[in-house]
Amino acid sequence: MTVSANPMLLTDEEFEKYRYIMDQPADNAAFAILNFVDHSQVYRILGGLQKNSDKVSFDDIKKLSYEVKSDADPKQVEFLINYMKKSIDDYFNDRTHFQFTPEETECLKRAAIFFNTHMTECTLSLAVRSLLKQYAAFKSTNVLMYTQLLPKYPYRRIISTMQFVMDVMDIKAFEPEGYGIIAIQKLRLVHALIRNRIEVNTLNKVPGAMWNDEWGKPINQQDMIFAVHTFSLEVIYGLIASGEKISDAEIQDYYYAWHLIGKALGVRDELNPSEFYIGYQVQNRIYKKEFIKDNPNGPALAEPLIKFMIEVLPLAKRKGVLGLVKLFNDKKDYDPIFKDILHLELDEASKFYTTMYNATDNLRHILIKIKYFFLPKAKRSDYFKDLARNEHRFFNSIIDIAKTWTDSHFRIADAFGVEAAEENEKESKKMPMWKRAVKYFFPNAEVK
């Protein structure tokens, strides 16, 4: 591993400049797409990319372009096709950030095994700690409110986030049959498309809203490292708060894996520490200036997440979900973050639900250890990998039940704005959770 960058050495003025720096390589590809003859068709074709081995079919794009723009100048269409083809080729074929050293590859695998063998805890920590802390940061969340997508379709972003994390934390995420590389490239491009659309004011937004330059640029470098740290630091601290015992080596492996993912997402090296303890300091530096009481975004974003958790968790009511929020967070944050900023009254939390969760979690760990103890030594090395794959499949099934679209992995559609979401909702109207469960496990069943 190389010597870690240390953004803590930057002055406040230098650090703040990163709120005005974006991601030029991804922005170039987004600009080419948005200036294409019919970019909605390009979105659909790019949306078909899932596996790392998938390729963009430019023949399909060319055919669609002439169909939708038959009255256009053929030379102009040809120029735009070639320009966009080069831009997208340059973007998707540039995999330098995924040329990992043997040491980095092993670290990514160890982090994936850790995530998947603790998937229940990691997923809950992601939901009730990582995302809620994201929503408490005022400037970073303005883009979520401005685009309207999260307020109108809150579950889509929550589930898409979970899908992304599962794609990049799969044990085979960065192998040809995996989904991690494409998921990262698509998310990076989604950010760039949103930035470009805000810059030219073509994005569906809250009527009358204007982007305030004091917020910085949309999805800027500081926002990006902040978000990456909520997926690494906050997940780890959530597990520790809930009572999990995690070694220093596991903590550093998990953090370093997300350092590599952050780099691939376009975070600049000088803002992307490779050491956990430096990352912790950087994240708290951002929290101190972004966590403010007068944050109208926080409650508007936090409440749909709580409702989502009530819907997907078995036998959970509001008090039970608030109990999980308490379990996975630190007592010092209960009032200043959850009460004052997000308007979540954790005093209403139920201890019964968290007690039941802890009991079943402890029992699961005991059973895992017993089974491992009685395994032949020759099979022990693959035991946790198999366990991770099984838990990964289980959570994928939960996500598939909860969502209202058919894509199996991280999608690019939400970069299009609310029109795509509305179109998608019409194709698959939301059913109650129990009906979706029936349809998932029994596809031929008639459920009205």
Segments the model singles out, each with a brief description of its role:
Residues 1-448:
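Mature, function-bearing regions of proteins
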